[in-house]
Amino acid sequence: MEEIEESPPTSEELVPCKICGRSFFPKVLKKHVPICQKTAAKRRKVFDSGRQRAEGTEISTVKPIKPKLQSSSSSSKSDKPEPPKKQSNWRRKHEEFIATIRAAKSINQVIKDGGPLPPPPPPSYDPDYIQCPYCQRRFGENAADRHIKFCKEQASRISNKSKLAGGDKTKPPARTQYKPPAPKKANSPTASSVSSRLPQRSAYGQGAGTGIPSSKPSSTGSIKSTPSGYSPLRNNSSSLTSPPSEGNMKPKGMVSQSSLRNPSTGIGMNKKKIQNADNCISRNDMKNENDFNYSTTGTKFCHECGTKYPVESAKFCCECGVKRMYI
């Protein structure tokens, strides 16, 4: 690359600008003079950050910062009178300070002696502060102007809410001594409706009350007894749609009133059941007369309150808590 030879410095003299006083070359000065005249004619305003921050708020006491000029400062001082200075309350503040010190010393002495504490000194208020007529608090001049407007709006809102609350009906008192309802008993309407569909306890079964389940009722509504040494026949266990009631719990060997009225039908059904039982009963069932072979099929309804079991594996009733019966 070829080296660029530096030109020797020119011997032109610098000419000062008449407006700003800076010195330029004659060629550059021709361009600078019109620009310098425009800038001198248009003075830039001093940026006031306080006024920008106060825009959009309730603060209107921000004063713009004025540029201080030596020529204008002397004339402004002579024209505008100074605002009167506030009288200092140094004597009053001094007396309050001495009173607080004396009160603190007296309290320390009483604590050492073990006597009763004296009452606290009365509160002192600054007379320069302005008291709010709504909340009775005191603020400075600038703060009081902002606070009183806000406090007035808040007080009007609270008064409107109290009027609306007073016009409404009084609320009922809270039930602090609330007790949950007792669980349903056997004599509830649901249990009575379920038990009405089932065969009632016979006269003989009510007197005995042994609690041993007998054979299932037939389609005619009569309950048959089984011979000694045989377990009751249980057919169509899956077709059980209604819960067994206490009326089904009959002692062995007891006959209902309906079967006594119709002896012919009862005898015929007993013969059929005995024949079926001879085919199904094993030798292990013949050992003890009181042994019953219960299967694992559970009832679909609770025998106490008639509520249907929600799950097949439920062992207790979800309504009354009675243990589930198995057939």
Swiss-Prot record:
Residues 187-199, 233-245, 255-267 have a biased composition (Polar residues). PROSITE patterns: ZF_C2HC_C3H. Residues 116-125 have a biased composition (Pro residues). GO terms for molecular function: zinc ion binding. Coiled coil: none annotated. Its cofactor is Zn(2+). Keywords: Metal-binding, Repeat, Zinc, Zinc-finger. A zinc finger (C2HC/C3H-type) spans 13-42, 128-157. Zn(2+) 2 binds at residues 132, 135, 147, 151. InterPro entries: ZC2HC1A/B-like (IPR026319), Znf_C2HC_C3H (IPR049899). Zn(2+) 1 binds at residues 17, 20, 32, 36. Residues 46-56 have a biased composition (Basic and acidic residues). Disulfide bonds: none annotated. Residues 63-76, 211-229 have a biased composition (Low complexity). It comes from the Eukaryota. Residues 40-96, 108-131, 154-271 are annotated as: Disordered. Belongs to the ZC2HC1 family. This is Zinc finger C2HC domain-containing protein 1A. The gene is zc2hc1a.
